[in-house]
């Protein structure tokens, strides 16, 4: 308990969704419930809210949401935005914003306080996290040129 810890679970719907099993889902939910007590934090990410709430009528998805103090919402389709509206008690304006967010924009929700944010990455951060194919090819070419001298 004297060391900070963090766990990151990307595509968490695969562990708590309809195609998962209760044992895996229970484990993820337990992490969400107890990790702060051990000086840790957990980050869960998903792009598919329907699957996130699919197992046992959304029991695990709801449990995770309820145990996460801070939620970050990026661009969503209309249907998913309506679901998030109910869960996070968003206004119509916030829902409209969510459906029109561009890359780098999002909504942070904590303690029922919501704020729209714009994320700015440094050149190094962008290079490390981009998934844009064209940007990756440009980065690869720069590294090849640098290595060639």
Which residue ranges define each predicted feature?
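Conserved P-loop NTPase motor cores
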Residues: 1-97, 123
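Conserved P-loop NTPase motor module
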Residues: 1, 99-149
């Amino acid at each position: 308990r004297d060391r900070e810890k963090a766990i990151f679970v990307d595509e968490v719907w695969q562990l708590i969704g309809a195609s998962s099993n209760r044992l895996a889902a229970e484990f993820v939910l337990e992490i969400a419930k107890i990790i702060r007590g051990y000086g840790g934090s957990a980050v869960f990410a998903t792009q598919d809210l329907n699957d996130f709430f699919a197992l046992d009528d959304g029991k695990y998805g709801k449990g995770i949401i309820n145990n996460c103090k801070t939620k970050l919402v990026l661009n969503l389709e209309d249907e998913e935005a309506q679901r998030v509206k109910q869960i996070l008690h968003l206004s119509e304006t916030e829902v409209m914003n969510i459906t029109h967010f561009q890359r780098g924009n999002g909504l942070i929700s904590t303690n029922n306080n919501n704020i729209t944010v714009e994320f700015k990455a440094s050149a190094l951060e962008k290079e490390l996290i981009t998934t844009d194919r064209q940007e990756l090819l440009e980065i690869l070419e720069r590294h090849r040129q640098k290595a060639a001298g």
